[in-house]
Each structure stands twice: as structure tokens, then as C-alpha cells.
Amino acid sequence: MNPEEFRQALLDHGIALTDAQMAQFARYYQLLVQTNEHLNLTAITAETEVYLKHFYDSLTGAFAYPKLQSQALTLCDIGAGAGFPSLPLKIAFPQLEVTIVDSLNKRINFLADLCDDLGLTGVYLVHDRAETFAAKGSPYREQFDLVTARAVARLVVLGELCLPAAKVGGAFLAYKASAVNDELKLATGAINKLGGQVAGTTKLTLPTKPEAEERNLVVIDKVAKTPGKYPRRPGVPAKKPLINV
């Protein structure tokens, strides 16, 4: 997917990028590849792959959660790495107020330089672990309209890490690959216990070659407060996931 194909694919979904926004994506790509030479940010570096598997993939969240396109939401991206999905969303929808959490300070420094270079305002960077960022007593707990995660961790783990940051009436948007049904079955009990309720899954395909890749965007509404004991201390959610609770 080259930049013009990226622009057209979004337009097909009603998202029209300006020339200035396209220039921001081009600069994002340039800085990502430059920095990646000395800091391991991504295994994907070819322009067509970055535009498809990072930029376009990040923006598919707006297909599943249309409020992103029109409302001035407070968005928290947990474990954003090189800024995905939150910074492509911020470029496309500048009214968003974005908080990015990552445990590696080098990535936070890259994101700070990137936001400065792109002229992005309303982006806040927090160097912290997901387990402690929205723990009981944290000023960030249950503060955000939408929490996103595009991580490889299982949904049952992501739910414990992300739902505590979402405000009641807000939501958690999980970007998952294929075969999400089994993950959902395992995670539903934990999601309910954490104050969440699965609202639905949007299935789509990325136009990759030789075969299209399946994506699933899971929207979990925050319907009740998360019990104070969650999330558990660092490392525990992944080692002892809340299965059969």
C-alpha cells in the first residue's frame, strides 16, 4: 500500500486526509525508519508495509469505534511502542487528546521527538508499566473515554491491564489478529469482573499479498468500576491470567 493507496483506502471509509496530514504520515515514516537503525522499534520498515500494517491498521480502529472520527475523546494507548495505534489516530483526528504509556524510556523519548517534529499537541507521554499506570490510587485510574491496545498479549491479560484506565461509560478497543473467538471465550468472565462488557467485534481484512490478513477489533464497554485489587502487581496478569473467574 503506497501513500496514495493509503489515502484512497481511507477515503473509501469516509476518512479524508488533507495534504498536510499526508505530509505528517510521510515524515512519521521517515523518522521511524531512521530511528529504527539504532533503536528496535519495528520489524516492518518497507514503506508499503508501514503504510499498510502500521498506519492503515491503526486507523481501522475508527471503523469499529466511529466516535474517534468526530468527538474530542481522551484516548489512552497502553504499550504503544512506536506510537501505534494512537499517533496515526491523532494525525487523522487532531481533536483527540492522547496519553501514551510505555515501559521503555527510549521509546518514550522517540515519541517525544516525533510529536515535536510533527507539531502534534495534546499528546502526553508516560513512562510506566501497564500494571501500575492505572492501579488503585493512580490519578489516571478510570479517567479515559477510550483505551487502546495493539499488543500481542491475550485478551484476558489486556483486559486486566487496560480496563482500569477506562472511565465508566467509556470503552476499551483491542486490536487483535485472527481467531479472536477463542480468546473472547476465555476472557469474558474476567472482562465482566473488571467492569467491562463486550459490545461487539468488527472483522476486516488488510489487503496484504499474497493473502489478505484478517483483523478483529474488539470493543469492550466499561459499564462498572474496576475492583480496587486490579490490575495486580507487575508480571502477575500475564503469569496468572484471570481465567475461569
From Swiss-Prot:
Localization per record: Cytoplasm
Any one Gene Ontology molecular-function term assigned to this protein's record: rRNA (guanine-N7-)-methyltransferase activity
Predominant cellular place of this UniProt entry's protein: cytoplasm
Binding site for S-adenosyl-L-methionine: G79, F84, A130, E131, R150
The entry's keywords: Cytoplasm, Methyltransferase, rRNA processing, S-adenosyl-L-methionine, Transferase
Protein's UniProt keywords contain Transferase: yes
One GO location term (cellular component): cytosol
InterPro entries: rRNA_ssu_MeTfrase_G, SAM-dependent_MTases_sf
The EC number(s) this enzyme carries: 2.1.1.-
Enzyme class, UniProt record, top EC level: transferase
Cited function: Specifically methylates the N7 position of a guanine in 16S rRNA.
Family, as annotated: Belongs to the methyltransferase superfamily. RNA methyltransferase RsmG family.
UniProt protein name: Ribosomal RNA small subunit methyltransferase G
Source organism of this protein record: Limosilactobacillus fermentum (strain NBRC 3956 / LMG 18251)
